[in-house]
Amino acid sequence: MNDQIYQDLKSLHLSGMAQSWMLLHETRKLGELTLQDGMAMLIQAEHDQRTNNRTARLLSQARFRYNASIEELTFDTAQGRDKNQILSLATCEYIKQGASVLVTGPAGVGKSFIASALGHQACFAGYKVRYANMQKLLEDMHMARIESKAARFFDKMAALDLLVIDDFGMKILDGQQLLDFMELIEDRHGRKSTIIASQLPVKNWYDILAKNPTIADAVLDRVVKSAYRIELNGVSMRK
């Protein structure tokens, strides 16, 4: 009977329940539980497994370069790592608002780590996330154009709850790059959240987009206005 129940639960794709049922059977605890308590335990096991599976899938799809977590952060207000601000962002309320987060500071102070940690936190909360180095993002947009898949590419990017763009500002954008970046930002503006990490202070971002002043103004208005800012300073943590 116990084996049949296990197989039935598996055939119904209730593997969390099935494993919990088998554990209860093997530890001889079935007889100690009321029907209500037993059902509650099985349902919780199924819920936990589905949540864990979904989180693992979201983390894999996000393609993070760094395995980072909020718990690993060392807070230091003097260096811009304000505990209250970062823990507030870790609630993912900014994602519900469709707001941007801008993380700036010199090389090695932890920009990518903080951006990635917030991205991981969003996955744990059930949001669809994608991490992308800016140069790789430009290459992906370029290839999508060449392969006549631009519409599909931009639709997929627009559907992400959170897009994490790392190393923004390493090169000046021009031509189609500016148009593509504008389209990416426009599709997400006010609807979906974007985290941008950069060595350049925000006041210098215009220079990266300056080859088309109209686009530069439009992009910065959408990205910077109402954004949450984390401005890091101090010596490199890589030393």
Locate each region found by the language model.
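Conserved P-loop
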Residues: Q36, R81-A159
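Active-site catalytic microenvironments for nucleophilic, acid-base chemistry
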Residues: A45, Q121-A125, D187
